Regions:
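Gram-negative bacterial Sec-dependent N-terminal signal peptides
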Residues: 1-21
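Outer-membrane beta-barrel "beta-signal"
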Residues: 345-361
Length: 361
């Protein structure tokens, strides 16, 4: 009898937890593609690889929301990245390297604490026809020395971040993020500050963002190491004409050491065709501190929806470089098996083609 009462008490406690918790969801993405790259070098110029995370980073995540009453909710996200081609974890082996935050939401907006996407990355992603992915996206353009260094230079995610996002106010929304450097005796080093504002109404989307990073020696940031006071400004927008969605964006990156002065322009389009979309973009980058420091990426792709959760995709990119630039198409937003990448050289033309499948669950 005592055992029965104990069992009922345990079950009752679980039921109480379940009733208080509005929802807990496990979700994920598995994304795999066959890709071939040619960096234009005289020797060892080509590589064929099976890689993970081309259109979207492969991941496993957990998210939940608890209704606290009065329009207030508590929520969390724990999301880990993986290389589906090898089964290994990504983001430097950190357990929840993609996202890990807890927060409160309500009529005042949303406040999140933890590792999360930066406002400027979300702004860039909302304008890019490739969603900063596949091989034509702005996130898939980098240098051999800088790793996943995007054309716009935006940090994907930041640690130790306090983020406030407004609710939608007549089409307007905004976000402010402050990331603590957590260095003894220095409140500046390692700090990251980001803000963004967006107007979205009907066919129109306009967004602007700014990010300032102070000497972040963090391998989990993207780019991996940012020099003193790196400042990034971004403005972009889209207009949906139904037959085509046009996109235009501008970015500028500078730092206090006068080692970076990049200007970037992106012109793109999304054309609905059948159960999918044709994607196209041109991205131009110029380093004003370097003579012959220009690069241009031309990309085209297609996504084909097999269902609401599964799609096929393919894309091709061609990146041309002046004598003192070595940009090229990385595989996509990642994570990736680094062995699948190929070194890039100044003044060379890099091409990449892939075909893959993405499944969401």
């Amino acid at each position: 009898m005592k055992k029965t009462l104990l069992a009922l008490a345990v079950l009752a406690s679980f039921a109480g937890v379940a009733s208080a918790q509005t929802s807990v969801t496990a979700y994920g993405v598995l994304d795999m593609a066959l890709q071939r790259e040619d960096n234009g070098a005289a020797v060892n110029a080509t590589k064929t690889a099976l890689d993970s995370g081309i259109q979207s980073g492969s991941r496993l995540g957990f998210k939940g929301t608890e209704d606290l009453g009065g329009g207030l909710n508590a929520h969390f996200v724990l999301e880990m990245g993986m290389n589906a081609d090898t089964g290994l974890s990504s983001q430097g082996g950190v357990l929840f390297g993609r996202q890990a935050f807890v927060g409160l939401g309500g009529g005042f907006g949303t406040v999140n604490l933890g590792r999360q996407y930066s406002p400027i990355f979300l702004a860039t992603d909302s304008v890019d026809p490739f969603d900063a992915g596949i091989i034509g996206g702005t996130a898939g353009v980098g240098t051999s020395t800088g790793g996943i260094l995007t054309m716009f230079g935006t940090p994907f995610r930041t640690n130790n971040t306090i983020n406030y996002t407004t609710n939608n106010l007549g089409g307007f929304s905004g976000s402010v993020a402050y990331s603590l450097g957590e260095q003894a005796g220095n409140n500046v080093n390692g700090r990251n500050i980001g803000v963004s504002g967006t107007y979205a109404n009907g066919p129109i989307l306009v967004t602007a963002a700014y990010n300032k990073a102070d000497n972040i020696p963090n391998a989990l940031a993207v780019p991996a190491v940012l020099p003193d006071a790196t400042k990034i400004g971004f403005v972009g927008g889209t207009f949906d004409f139904k037959v085509v969605k046009a996109a235009l964006a501008f970015g500028k990156t500078t730092d206090d050491l006068n080692t970076v002065d990049n200007k970037t322009v992106m012109l793109g389009a999304t054309v609905p065709v059948g159960p999918g979309n044709i994607l196209g973009s041109w991205v131009h980058q110029k380093n004003d501190l370097t003579n012959g420091g220009k690069s241009n990426q031309y990309a085209i792709g297609y996504t084909y929806d097999l269902s609401k959760r599964t799609n096929l995709y393919t894309s091709y990119s061609r990146t041309t470089n002046d004598a003192n630039d070595n940009a090229g198409a990385l595989a996509g937003p990642g994570p990736h098996d680094t062995a699948a990448q190929i070194a890039l050289g100044n003044g060379l033309t890099d091409t990449m083609f892939n075909v893959g499948i993405r499944h969401k669950f």
